[in-house]
Amino acid sequence: MFDFIDKVLSSFESCFSRKAAFRWFVILTLGLMLRSDKLGVTSVIRDLALKPDCYLSMLHFFHASSWSLHRIRQCWFQTVLRFFPLYQEGDFHVLIGDGVKQSKEGRRIPGVKKLCQESENSAKPQFIHGHMFGGLGILSGSIHSMACVPLSIRLHDGLQDTHDWESSTVSGASHVVQMVEDAYLAAKTFANSILLLDRYFLSVPALKRLQELISGEAVHMEMVTKAKCSCTAFEKPAPRKSRRGRPPKKGKAVRLKNLFESHKEQFREAEMILYGKKEKLRYYSIDLLWGQKLYQELRFVLVEYHGTQSILAGTSLELDPLSMIRLYSYRFRIECTFRELKQQTGAFGYHFWSKYMPRLDYYRKKTEPAALEQVKNDHARMKILQTVRAIEMHMALSCIAMGTVQCLSLRTEGKLRTEQIRYQRTPSKGKVSEGAMMHYLRKHIFRFMGQNPALRITRLIQEMQEQSEICEDLLAS
């Protein structure tokens, strides 16, 4: 187990131009995998028994110039492809994308803006000030036990005003377009892929960008998403006799929701495994044109399941309807990953801020300039971009930490049970949960280091550990 962690973390050494930066990368990533609380980098110092002097060095690491965020992400993609048991649908890997919003009260944190949360959870306020992230993961494991390994989590909104700044890497595209771009960047490493998204991402800009990316490229990526119940598509235009004028691009309009009644005799019945249970459902598949001024041919699958009606949409006309239904049932896995990132590793508990960032005004009028628009000094802009870089580096480390924990859970399936680690009233079936695996690592980390003194990560951690003196009073029984 510990040698696998060593292999994963050692594969990132080429991403750092200084040995010290690589050492702090190893310590911080391992610390995120086993820390017992979410009180900043001090939790890493406590759980790994490091010297108190490490505190400032660990903070400085996030602002160091000795690493490239792009290279670290690319190395993480390659590491996942090399070491992780990835799930495949035919010849396609399965990517999952979604957005996640995190509340932030800091007035000088770049990228914070007013956001609307559409959720049925009464604990979530409708409006918050915080960060809007785009998360991307890949399915790993088998059909009976799988996890969504986080590949990247990037800021997708709130930073558009920095797009024209010098040395800025911020994209000026919308959230849905950036999600497609992030997925295709990952697909270049994992080869042909299917991207699962929720209905928010079924839009003309997203489909246009996907067509631009896959045209003329060897890597192919398809998209499976959900359509709104009010979705309207179009039949193909009927062939017409040659005459003057532009030929029609679309045919008769079709309200997809009405097909549940008008075509109910054409629905097929099937049984399949959905969300871990064998279920009965009815479905109907039809290929139609969709998108104003785009009119791209999509495959729509109408599904009746437990009294609910859903409409799925896919860009592939060769994908089996039942495969689309099963694939979309895996989309919720990224929601589970977001939950574990929040509750276990504390990935969204960062608080990077900059004194060069103008104070955020919660009551700013629309006619007044935004906070980032007020920054004109080049030095201040550079410091703000460094803060954004630190935030995304923290998210990258959290993805690596959580992905490694998930892979350990999959590798130890059948060998390690939750009951052997800690008591749980309802232990997870199959693989050990991420929280239980982190508890196991936290409990046995020093035993692992003692059993593997020659490993690279063991030596890097021991160099920074504090050698405390033994107090006689503590030996009294």
What function would you assign to each model-found segment?
Residues 1-13, 91, 108, 148-477:
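Single, function-defining residue in the core of a domain
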Residues 1-63, 69:
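Gly/serine-rich nucleotide phosphate-binding loop at the start of the catalytic core
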Residues 16-24, 123-128, 383-395:
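Structural motif
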Residues 23-26, 75-77, 117-118, 380-381:
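Short linear interaction motifs
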Residues 26-32, 137, 398, 402:
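Contiguous, well-ordered alpha-helical segments that form the cores/surfaces of helical PPI scaffolds
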Residues 33-38, 49-52, 66, 104, ...:
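Short alpha-helix boundary/capping elements
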Residues 40-53, 137-160, 289-294:
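Glycine/proline-rich, flexible active-site/cofactor-binding loop segments
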Residues 64-157:
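Active-site-proximal, Lys/Arg-enriched surface segment
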